[in-house]
Amino acid sequence: MVDMSNVKLRIENIVASVDLFTDLNLEKVIEICPSSKYNPEEFPGIICRFDDPKVALLIFSSGKLVVTGAKSVDDIKRAVYKLIEMLKKIGAKFTREPQIDIQNMVFSGDIGMEFNLDAVALILPNCEYEPEQFPGVIYRVKEPRAVILLFSSGKIVCSGAKSEQDAWEAVKKLLRELEKYGLIEEEEEW
């Protein structure tokens, strides 16, 4: 059985879609958003950056948002409620709680062992490896849906997960497959 205690995962980015359930006047919104850009000829929304929490928000007149760059779900919530408080100052009315949906979480990690990627690519199903184009194996997990980039050093990037639990489950599935096909060496006891 694969030992998961050596595996480390760290959140690098979370992307969420948000519905504030109210229309916004972007001409007014741009006035209250520091560190923001609005050029409706190029893009139909405001690009706004917060330093605390450190995130970027795409704000649309429909009251829909995209929040990216967060390192935690709590950061997403703090950014949304910070924006709501700013919007109230320009007369925006809110009749219900915002709907926040996590769309993607990106994790970096280390499995704690090295891999021969040529062997992995030959034996492991659901993977791609084009070393001339990219130095890692691309492994696709169907359930939970995620993509894991596996590098020869044992470093990984997991994207597409909607929760930390999904990311861990995807990594477990990869490790089980690697073990099943004999691509993980059992550590010898001395």
Curated annotation (Swiss-Prot):
It comes from the Archaea. The keyword DNA-binding applies. InterPro entries: TBP, TBP_archaea, TBP_CS, TBP_dom_sf. Keywords: DNA-binding, Repeat, Transcription, Transcription regulation. GO terms for molecular function: DNA binding; DNA-binding transcription factor activity; general transcription initiation factor activity. Sequence repeats lie at residues 11-87, 102-178. One of its GO terms (biological process) is DNA-templated transcription initiation. Belongs to the TBP family. General factor that plays a role in the activation of archaeal genes transcribed by RNA polymerase. Binds specifically to the TATA box promoter element which lies close to the position of transcription initiation. HAMAP family: TATA_bind_prot_arch (MF_00408). This is TATA-box-binding protein.
